[in-house]
């Protein structure tokens, strides 16, 4: 199964351009760490991105919470992405009809498609949401993740919702290259959906607001995900930013090497 192959091998075989770029980057930098930087000022976002950039494969943003957002922020972030070699994932969680999301993705003040390599969407509105986003994203070489499972307590993203989301992805593999999920989604030998898993923590199990945390090993080795998404465990400790980023990068990479050893004997 592709889930258990080296990232470099998967990159060579992958049909999706965005997935290839991500897998190649992960192998090149030896990191499967994505950091969710949910801060509300331009200064904080740039400062954190610069500090953790060397250790991540993906910087995950909620760009609409930045109170002093401007075009210069995007330009500075793009320069940091070149400097440190990482991709952007704007965690927009689109959830409207195709015609609406098309404009939300391309236009408005954020112009997400112009700078973010990866974005994501709920499948509640049906397949039209994928078609609308693809109209904008495909010509730019962007990639889409579907929200198949969430890490919050009581989430409704389970059962038939998850199953139907996977079927939608299979029908749109030119643009959809993976999922936000808690477990691997590949069921067939020729499938290679990349799974990015939020809710990863080494020190705590929850936050009192419904978030449930798992360790990098649980996520990568036991559940078969590919990228760990860490938020407050890194940016929540400003005096230990680099130390924590290095710690999670190492834990994630060690888990990946363990998975390779287990399945490629």
Swiss-Prot record:
The keyword Disulfide bond does not apply. The keyword rRNA-binding does not apply. Pathway: Pyrimidine metabolism; UMP biosynthesis via de novo pathway; UMP from orotate: step 2/2. Substrate binds at residues 38, 60-62, 91-100, 213, 232. CDD domains: OMP_decarboxylase_like. PROSITE patterns: OMPDECASE. This is Orotidine 5'-phosphate decarboxylase. It comes from Rhizopus niveus.
């Amino acid at each position: 199964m592709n889930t258990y192959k080296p990232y470099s091998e998967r990159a060579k075989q992958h049909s999706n351009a965005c997935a290839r770029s991500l897998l190649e980057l992960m192998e090149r930098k030896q990191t499967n760490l994505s950091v969710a930087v949910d801060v509300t000022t331009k200064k904080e976002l740039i400062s954190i991105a610069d500090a953790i950039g060397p250790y991540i494969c993906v910087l995950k943003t909620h760009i609409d919470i930045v109170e002093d957002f401007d075009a210069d922020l995007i330009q500075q972030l793009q320069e940091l992405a070149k400097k440190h070699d990482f991709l952007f994932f704007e965690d927009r969680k689109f959830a409207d009809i195709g015609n609406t999301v098309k404009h939300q993705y391309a236009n408005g003040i954020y112009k997400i498609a112009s700078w973010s390599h990866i974005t994501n969407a709920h499948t509640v509105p049906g397949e039209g949401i994928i078609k609308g986003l693809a109209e904008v994203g495909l010509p730019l070489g962007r990639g889409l993740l579907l929200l198949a499972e969430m890490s919050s307590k009581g989430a409704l993203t389970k059962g038939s919702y998850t199953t139907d989301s996977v079927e939608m992805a299979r029908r749109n593999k030119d643009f959809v290259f993976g999922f936000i999920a808690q477990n691997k989604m590949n069921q067939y030998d020729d499938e290679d959906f990349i799974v990015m898993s939020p809710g990863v923590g080494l020190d705590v199990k929850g936050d009192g607001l419904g978030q449930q945390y798992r360790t990098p090993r649980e996520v990568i080795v036991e559940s078969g995900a590919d990228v760990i998404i860490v938020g407050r465990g890194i940016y929540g400790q400003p005096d230990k930013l680099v130390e924590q980023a290095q710690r999670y990068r190492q834990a994630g990479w060690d888990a990946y090497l363990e998975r390779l050893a287990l399945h490629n004997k």
